[in-house]
Amino acid sequence: MDFDLSDEQNLLRDVTREALTRTYDIETLLKVGDTELGWSRDVWSQLAEIGILGLGFDPDESGQIELMVVLTELGRRLAPEPVAQAALIPGGLVAELGNDEQRKLLDQVAEGQTLLALAHQEPGMRGLSVRVTTRAECQDDSWTLTGVKNPVLSGDCADSFIVSAALPAGGVGLFVVDADAVNRHPFRTFDGQRAAQLNLDSVAAQPLGVGGDATHGLQKALIRHQSALCAEAVGAMEEALRLTTDYLNSRKQFGVPLSKFQTLTQRAADMYVSLELARSMSFYAAMAIAEGSFDPVIAARAKLQICRSGRHIAQEAIQLHGGIGVTAEYPIGHYAARLTAIGQTLGSTDDQLHTLIGALGGYGTVSL
């Protein structure tokens, strides 16, 4: 695997970083976070102009490395725009499985005019499970869905949903549902993101593409989303570490900077080690997808390291900042909240370990 970014990918990173750095500081983030939407339509339009909202829609290009680059920069600035969950992940499903009519949605998504959301998670669901209790029923070639989806990230603002449901003949199907047809209850997550619960009561739905069992396509989308979360977490960890080291260099105690105390610098060094472990696993997971390998074991390894590194860096960043680290006006607590939320999205540490333990039986025994 070649872990070097191309010139185009470096340019995409630099343009995204410049746009977000120019837009977001802690005051702006707090102000935007208090709005009903929770993110900026103006920034969304800027991301569309850059070409970010259509990454990966081309069937000849995975776009996974570009997705990783963009999500890392979003994580670095704590940008609340739902690039992955309201555009790239559900849009990628439509690009892969949708029919010609449904693919017309992709131009609107890429231009920032339409928001999609993947409604797959259900109460009690853990990790990358594709088992759902929402039922799909067909009568006279018309499909209806019944069930509950929660949490649906960006479900509060989506114009259309890609909904997973159990098929009568077995397997899991994917359906396009208009937002006006569902009963949704928006809520705010503890890290300031937006989500919703969808109550589906015989809601009219259109099969995505030719219909039938879409389990494989759904699994690929979930693995892509997990990789995107890993990339976002790496960006957040990078900035949390930078803020912490800057604080240690500037804050004085007993007449000298805190960075002069060896114990504190060693703790910062341990944070750096955790960051590099997370970065390498995130890159590895993205590269595997870019090469066509949607391996849940690779995804679990990456997410496990992200969970561990994120928890370590978030906790140490707050501890090394002292009391200011938990104030709302200072950014480090918000980075800790986002890293904690990412650690629980699409599977916690325990869920990743469960996946890895379950895969052990496939390696066989070693004879000496």
What would you call each of these model-derived segments?
Residues 79-100:
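N-terminal glycine-rich flavin-associated loop
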Residues 131-133, 151-152, 178-210:
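Flexible, small-/acidic-enriched active-site or ligand-binding loops
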Residues 112-114, 130-132, 157-159, 171, ...:
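A generic structural signal for well-ordered coil/turn residues at beta-strand boundaries
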Residues 112-123:
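A short, Trp-centered hydrophobic/proline-enriched beta-strand micro-motif
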Residues 1-78, 97, 112, 138, ...:
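Alpha-helical interface subdomain recognition
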Residues 119, 146-182:
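A short core secondary-structure module
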Residues 51, 71-74, 177-181, 203:
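Short Ser/Thr-interspersed hydrophobic loop/turn segments at strand-loop and sheet-helix junctions
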